[in-house]
Regions:
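Vicinal oxygen chelate
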Residues: 11-22, 27-56, 74-84, 125-152, ...
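Acetyl-CoA-dependent GNAT
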Residues: 28-29, 67-69, 117-120, 187
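N-terminal beta-strand motif that seeds the catalytic metal site of vicinal oxygen chelate
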Residues: 37-44, 64-90, 95, 99-102, ...
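Short, structured interface segments
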Residues: 52-70, 182
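Short amphipathic alpha-helices in soluble, non-transmembrane regions
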Residues: 94-95, 150-155
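Short, basic/aromatic recognition patches
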Residues: 157-163
């Protein structure tokens, strides 16, 4: 739909996907490989599709196309590998006001978070934001500063304090118990 320059040789291509926005960051310089990928897959519901289709993007990221309504997915869903499903579920409910649909399945706005048990912590604390792979989730908020402060007060790890991205947005990052990056975005065109 459109492209934003993020600085440092990074451009972000944004595509509308129903009620969600898929953001693809393109870096001028090579990015390091992430040690692990706690964001295991992106699932996208498509009307008229009869059966799930598992695909990979050019970087090897798992993208699964599913029929609309498959496992409750009517837009997008993200499969997260977590060390403790109950702990992660509690985090997303308490910190980000997600609602539990069923054990390990959370509604976040109109999207779903699918929590899978992993054998160990999936993202080391030092995992960089700028690396290859599915790197972060973005939640649109009305007040970035208030959302960031609320998340910290509820127990989230602060990863990057709120900053302005020109006149486009004000963003901040927190991390979940498994080190997954979560962007809190107060986008001028949305708020």
């Amino acid at each position: 739909d459109h492209t934003l320059k993020l600085g440092g040789g990074v451009r972000q291509h944004r595509y509308q996907a129903g009620d969600a926005v898929l953001k693809l960051n393109d870096a001028r310089d090579p990015l390091p490989a992430a040690e692990r990928q706690p964001i295991a897959a992106l699932l996208v519901a498509l009307a008229g599709l009869r059966a799930p289709r598992e695909l990979q993007d050019p970087d090897g990221n798992a993208i699964t196309l599913v029929p609309a309504g498959h496992e409750g997915i009517n837009g997008v869903a993200v499969r997260l590998q977590v060390a403790d499903v109950a702990q992660s579920s509690q985090f997303y409910q308490q910190v980000l006001a997600c609602t539990e649909v069923s054990p390990g399945v959370l509604r976040c706005g109109k999207a779903l978070l699918l929590l899978e048990q992993a054998s160990a912590r999936c993202a080391p604390d030092t995992a960089p934001l700028a690396a290859k792979g599915l790197r972060y989730l973005t939640l649109q908020v009305f007040d970035c500063d208030a959302a960031y402060a609320s998340a910290l007060a509820a127990g989230a790890e602060g990863a990057k304090a709120p900053i302005n991205m020109g006149s486009t947005a004000r963003i901040a990052f927190i991390r979940d118990p498994d080190g997954i990056w979560i962007e809190l975005s107060e986008r001028a065109s949305v708020t």
